[in-house]
Amino acid sequence: MYVLQLKALGVDQIARFDFMPPAPPAAHVADALAHLESLRALDEEGRLTQLGERMAEAPLSPMMARAILHDASCADEMLTIAAMTSVGSPFDGSESVAAQIERRQFVAEEGDHLTLLNVYEAFQRAGASSRWAAQHGLSYATLKRARSIRAQLVAFVTRQWSWPWRRAGDEQAVRRCLAAGFFRQAVRYDGS
């Protein structure tokens, strides 16, 4: 994130930048630059792209910003996922069998991001009720905070990026957005 911000501030030679001690290892800086290039935030010469400029504006990690910017039709879902990942686990830590059974309904086999989306959407459908959250083994305080962060992100995207606001309602499209930003964290089950 800091390397992208430095690029946005016009620092061209990140490797030669005078970081405050302790400076990050050169290998970490090189890896960050390569990652930003793979996200298309930087071009082959290490210059900030238009996409990179937009990513740098966002109060998000470069990966999440890239995922959101991948497709405007998924902005609604992606902003929910961004908010939910920023607040920690919505599960209240209850180990009771009843709570575990209630939580299973939200689990998406495609991964944690879609599970978090399911939790938030169910919370919204239930009227953002504290009682509903408690009945489902969820932390009302965490969900309320995610709701507030999401509202801030919606305001940012609407104001700063002037995007057409849409909801895909298409899990495949959401997964493509996630892959655009988080491809480095993807794994493939090998059957073992």
Where are these regions (language model features)?
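Second RecA-like catalytic domain
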Residues: M1-S192
